[in-house]
Amino acid sequence: MAKKNQVARNERERKRVHQVNHGFDVLRNRLQPKNHTKKWSKADTLREAVKYIQQLQVLLNQDPQQPSVSSSTPDYTMNNSNNFNNYAVKEEFSMYLPQNYCPQNQMSVPHGDVSHNFNSPTSSVSSSSYSPTQMCYPPVSYSNYPHH
């Protein structure tokens, strides 16, 4: 019986590692320039994702009268290679979202149901006010890190 539990636990861990690695591959494919020959490490991928998210935040916080893309941000311009298809969730990202997720501009949640059921095999957390990341980690400031 203990052997069966260990085998099942190992299988769950293999699946989890595979899912994490797949997530990094998807993120890397979205962010890494096509002409870049060396594959980014996980740390590099996360670092570049943070930069990209920060640049998107700047774009979202801009005055609507200003141009939407600045020439001072050459790393991630809003071109077709890094376009997130008008914020639509791609099928490749669906495994990382709540099961009942739907963008606000495409569908409404029936009868005001805002419960979140996450696809994680080990997750039993349900909350409508915090993301899983916010529930697990304190807010982080990246201002102390050097920009490369």
UniProtKB/Swiss-Prot annotation:
Gene Ontology molecular function, alphabetical: DNA-binding transcription factor activity, RNA polymerase II-specific; protein dimerization activity; RNA polymerase II transcription regulatory region sequence-specific DNA binding; sequence-specific DNA binding
One of the GO BP terms on file: regulation of neuron differentiation
Residue ranges with Low complexity bias: 120-132
Chain positions covered by the region annotation Disordered: 1-21, 63-83, 112-132
Keyword presence, Transcription regulation: yes
The bHLH domain, residue ranges: 4-56
Location of the region described as Basic motif in the Swiss-Prot/TrEMBL record: 4-17
Record's subcellular location: Nucleus
Span list, region Helix-loop-helix motif: 18-56
Keywords (A to Z) from UniProt: Developmental protein, DNA-binding, Neurogenesis, Nucleus, Transcription, Transcription regulation
Keyword DNA-binding tagged: yes
Effect of loss of the gene: RNAi-mediated knockdown disrupts differentiation of ASE L/R sensory neurons.
GO cellular component: nucleus; RNA polymerase II transcription regulator complex
Pfam families named in the record: HLH
Biased composition (Polar residues): 63-78
SUPFAM superfamilies, alphabetized: HLH, helix-loop-helix DNA-binding domain
Superkingdom, natural source: Eukaryota
Function as written in the Swiss-Prot or TrEMBL entry: Probable transcription factor, involved in determining neuroblast cell fate, morphogenesis and aspects of terminal differentiation in both left/right symmetric and asymmetric neuronal lineages.
Protein name stated in the entry: Helix-loop-helix protein 14
Lineage, uppermost ranks: Eukaryota, Metazoa, Ecdysozoa, Nematoda, Chromadorea
Chain's gene name: hlh-14
